[in-house]
Design a protein with these regions (language model features):
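Active-site-facing substrate-recognition patch
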Residues: 1-26
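Alpha-helical structural signal in soluble globular domains
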Residues: 14, 42-50, 110
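Charged, well-structured alpha/beta interaction segments
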Residues: 24-45, 101
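Residues at the starts of beta-strands that form the adenosine-phosphate
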Residues: 26, 57, 90, 119-122
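Short loop/turn motifs enriched for small/polar and acidic residues
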Residues: 30-33, 61-66, 125-127
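Short, glycine/charge-rich flexible loops or terminal/linker lids adjacent to PRPP-binding catalytic cores
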Residues: 53-91
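Internal catalytic-core helix/loop-beta-alpha segment
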Residues: 82-112
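PRPP-dependent phosphoribosyltransferase catalytic core
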Residues: 109-169
């Protein structure tokens, strides 16, 4: 997926969130660190560009200490930045790629340590739908792909923005 298609997909996801959550008075958007931040930044900024009257509660969630592979790898924690209460709110978690579901499970654990949300929805840029190890399904999907275990999906968010599917062997 090249940059034009990627931006179009992110704008579509933004419009889906607007359709279901406008005016965002009881909704907060939370990006999962590290790779969900660029996507949640884009979506939040785009919504506020087309609806400047809207104030979105926006935060960033670090899941380092909630991962089930924490002891097996070296992870440098980031800072969780939730400058609002999620108590009774509708929360939209945003990440780049949904693969096994383990990152989302860790995000749910981290989120619940910050309060009890009324509802939690999941917004994903790329859904690798046949690789799930946990019963987790997204509510908003940018692109759904069929991939095998030896393939990887990488979201590049620098000067060139794109999604790459490649073989890892």
């Amino acid at each position: 997926m090249e940059e034009d298609q990627l931006k179009l997909t992110l704008k579509r996801l933004s419009h889906e969130l607007i359709e279901n959550h406008y005016p965002f008075t009881n909704t907060c958007i939370i990006g999962i660190q590290p790779r969900g931040i660029a996507i949640s930044d884009f979506i939040t900024q785009y919504i506020q560009t087309i609806h400047p009257e809207v104030t979105i509660s926006y935060g960033k969630l670090d899941i380092t200490f909630y991962r089930d592979d924490f002891r097996g790898q070296i992870h440098i924690p980031s800072i969780t930045d939730l400058p609002f209460s999620i108590e009774g709110k509708q929360v939209i978690l945003i990440d780049d790629v949904l693969y096994t579901g383990r990152t989302i499970r860790a995000a749910m654990d981290a989120l619940l340590d910050n309060g009890r949300a009324q509802k939690v929805e999941l917004c994903i840029l790329v859904d690798r739908k046949f690789s799930r190890e946990l019963p987790i399904q997204p509510d908003y999907v940018g692109k759904s792909i069929d991939s095998i275990v030896t393939q990887k999906v990488k979201v590049v968010w620098g000067d060139e923005k794109r999604v790459i599917l490649y073989d890892s062997i």
